[in-house]
Each structure stands twice: as structure tokens, then as C-alpha cells.
Amino acid sequence: MQSTSIHGSVVIASDADLDVAVSSLVPVLDLVETEETWDRIDHALAQFQILTKCGATKVPSYIMRVHEFAPCISRSLLSDRTRLSGTASDVLNSMAPRLGECFAPFVNVFIPPLLQLCARTNKVSLRRAEKSLHLICRHCHLPYILSCLVHALKEKSSSLRASAAECMVIYMESCDLSQLQKRVTDVEQAIRLLATDAHPQARATCRHLYGLYAGLFPERRATCVILCLHTAFSVHFLQQRNVTLRRFNL
């Protein structure tokens, strides 16, 4: 039976409670975003966030419900409507710290659209996406997150690369050694990519990232430095070659 919290919200204590609470949200979160529907979708997402904060993450069927609502959450994250996008981010901000490592099924569902927002010129969208990513990196400690971030470091957007680099630092600061050992090669690849990044903020973050890495894996430092030097030399060689080819119209 549902009980009520001091602020009047329903406390979710069982799968049955959650089923009742989301019954009115399901048809709304299946809607396509239009001028007529977006406000209803926004309200439904806000209601789901309240349920998330009121115990829903502790009942087994919550994960199933997130899978069900994931398409709507992802679409809303990428919406051009700032309010709707912000509400979708708020859902993740409440979800990730409470789920922790149980967030695993949603890494490849929600991380890509959040990273996509980091490539946008809208600063509000960028900061919101970074906040969500930081919370996920800080609380979820899932190795696959690193693979997503390394992939982002190869993209053209400088703001995306800088955001991904900062997420790498937060992830390393939040995880213990045993968790990081599983994906240390991802960290090393990130350092090599960032060491030659054109964006000054990304290079500055690389120094911080390397400092964390060197402290945790002192026995691997020498190899990493050699690989970084090799990468830097290769990049410089290619740049000089391209300059020469252009100069002689080759």
C-alpha cells in the first residue's frame, strides 16, 4: 500500500506501488513531441523524477520502467526546447546516484545523447549535459563509460573533447584501483589523444589526468610516456607533410 511522505509525494515501496504511480505516465511518454504535446511530456518526466526520488529505484521493476521510458528520455534530452531537455537531464541526475552500478544497462542509452549535447553551441545545454555526465561518472563506476569517453575524444567538436576529458578525470578520482585496472588501456589511450589535442583546455585536463594515472599506475608510466612521444611525433610529421604538399600543390 502506498504511503505519503512529508512533502505529499507518494513513497514507492513495492512494484505494485510503482505500477499504480506510472499508469498515467505511460501513454504520455509514448507521445511524439509536438507543439501540442511537449508540455505534457515535460510534466510526465517531472513526475517520473519525483517517483525516482521517492524510493522507486529500490523496487525491482524500476529498471524495466526506465527501459520502457528510455526512448522518450533520450529524445527529450536532445529536444530544442530547453525546458524539456532540462527536465530529462533532471531525471538522469536523480536516477544515476541512486542506481549506482545498476545504471549499467543505460550507459549506451543515455551517455551518447549527453555527449551529443556537449557538442552543441548552446551553453545551457552543454552545462546541463556536463552535470549529468559528472554525476554518472562519480556515482556509477562502470568501466564501459571510459570507452564512450575515449570515443568522444576522437570527435571534431572541441567542446565535446574538453567535456569528455573532464569526465575522465572525475571517473578516475571516483573509482578505486581495482575498477580502473580493468580499463587502464582506455585511460592510456585518452592521455595519448589529449596530449596532442588542439584545444588548450583539453591539454590542461590531460596533465591532471596523467597525474592521477601516474600516481595509480607508476609501473606503467614509462611506457605511456614513450607512446605519447611517438603519437606527438607522428602528428607533427603528418602536419609538416601536409604543409609541404600544399606548398608545392602536390
For the regions a language model picked out, list residue spans one by one.
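Short inter-helical turns and helix N-cap capping residues of alpha-solenoid HEAT/ARM repeat scaffolds
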Residues: E36-T37, D80-T82, T121-K123, K156-S158, ...
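N-terminal "cap/leader" segments of large eukaryotic alpha-helical scaffolds
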Residues: M1-A56, H236-L250
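Active-site loop segments of alpha/beta catalytic cores
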Residues: F103-F106, C118, N122
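Eukaryotic acidic, Ser/Thr-rich intrinsically disordered low-complexity regions
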Residues: Q2-H7, E188, R192-L250
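Hydrophobic residues within the alpha-helices of tandem HEAT/HEAT-like
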Residues: Q47-K53, I73, L77, T87-L99, ...
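Core helices of alpha-solenoid repeat scaffolds
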Residues: D15-L29, L51, V59-S74, L92, ...
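Short acidic, glycine/proline-enriched loop segments that cap or flank alpha-helices
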Residues: T57-S61, K156, C175-K182, D197-Q201
